[in-house]
Amino acid sequence: MSAHGTNEGALWGGRFESGPAAAMAALSKSTHFDWVLAPYDVRASQAHARVLHKAGLLGDEDLATMLDGLGRLAADVASGDFIPSESDEDVHGALERGLIDRVGPDVGGRLRAGRSRNDQVATLFRMWLRDAVRRVAEGVLDIVDALATQAAAHPSAVMPGKTHLQAAQPVLLAHHLLAHTHPLLRDVQRLRDFDVRAAVSPYGSGALAGSSLGLDPEAIAAELAFDSSAENSIDATSSRDFAAEAAFVLAMIGVDLSRMAEEVILWSTPEFGYITLADAWSTGSSIMPQKKNPDVSELTRGKSGRLIGNLTGLLATLKAQPLAYNRDLQEDKEPVFDSVAQLELLLPAITGLVATLEFHTDRMAELAPAGFTLATDIAEWLVRQGVPFRVAHEAAGACVRVAEARGAGLEDLTDEELAGVDPALTPDVREVLTVEGSIASRNARGGTAGIRVAEQLGGVRQLSESLREWCR
């Protein structure tokens, strides 16, 4: 069985007489996914070098040499001139090798003092995630803005609101579109809240027990744009609840987008006929020439399942791990990396889809009163006349039976038919027996009346802009 040298490409050795077996090395290897942390690793190493210098563990000349070498290494990583070798176990070992190649083993070998891969990777993961969630948040806000723009373009268009996918009450199309913005805005707020907890640096925690070399965790935390350093070194190196929290919010974004995607799929069918998809955001069939498929929406549904799976897998990895660090945590990054990558693919496509939707408002208006959607308006009109709601509810239901029996809408009932159901149903009830009257009457905060929807639109735009400030 072939073996590596005891320290080739790795940050450990010495007590071993031989390196790991080839299969063991392959199992341990993580450069194929953790290389995305390389720019953060170099930044953290630059900060660590300054902390070592401040503690008297690195002389002025060595500090200058090390920072110069790290700067050159950072440039080579960015350009692709420096990449991991086959023998490198992980991003940390690869970069130490790169530094030693540039400044020699005497200076390069000093950087490892006072830090462990345990506190190092926990810090880098947080740094990467804090940047990643801001990118995701901006993509989510692009969708919010596209929905708001469509809402503003259709201020008076009406449609049938549904519960249980059955006709319920008429609403404004703008009201419905804005209903999708609020969960997405909350998702961005969750990312912002997550960032508060992620902004705690594990650096200086060592393997688990902290440092004995007089290093300053607060100094390195400040340089790396953290709000503070960790209060407990064992917790800092072994906990990944920050990763699980991020994975949850990313999955929740997927769920919220999947719900919207499902409506796009339904609305684009001939049976609904509410929308036409732009050619740029549709695909065809290899055999059926007439097809125009809502693939963006279907892929959104599919990827939401993938995001949920990433969260579930991560939680399963984290359960039952005793304190402190365990190698299981090598499995913590790929699910989160993948969730971010999937959303970065998905969000621009959904933005383009939403921005180019063509709404058939005449079709929506035609269906708005169908299915007796004005029945609740009859009941509530009776309540305003002093009729108890239980009685009013039964009277409105009786009106539905009469209309259904003769294949008419509620608005088509005669004065005699209305009075025959309940004498309280005078001709004045007709003020709510129109879609426009029904919508205008729902003018409480949050309702579908035009004035309230305009308020909602303003609030959505204001909150979106405020959240963009955090992203920047």
Swiss-Prot record:
Catalytic activity: 2-(N(omega)-L-arginino)succinate = fumarate + L-arginine
Keyword list, A-Z: Amino-acid biosynthesis, Arginine biosynthesis, Cytoplasm, Lyase
GO cellular component: cytosol
Repeat keyword on record: no
Coiled coil: none
Keyword flag Lyase: yes
GO annotation (BP), single: arginine biosynthetic process via ornithine
SUPFAM superfamilies, per database record: L-aspartase-like (SSF48557)
Enzyme Commission identifier(s): 4.3.2.1
Molecular-function GO terms, alphabetical: argininosuccinate lyase activity
PANTHER family: ARGININOSUCCINATE LYASE
Family according to the record: Belongs to the lyase 1 family. Argininosuccinate lyase subfamily.
HAMAP family for the chain: Arg_succ_lyase
This protein's name: Argininosuccinate lyase
Native source organism of the sequence: Rhodococcus opacus (strain B4)
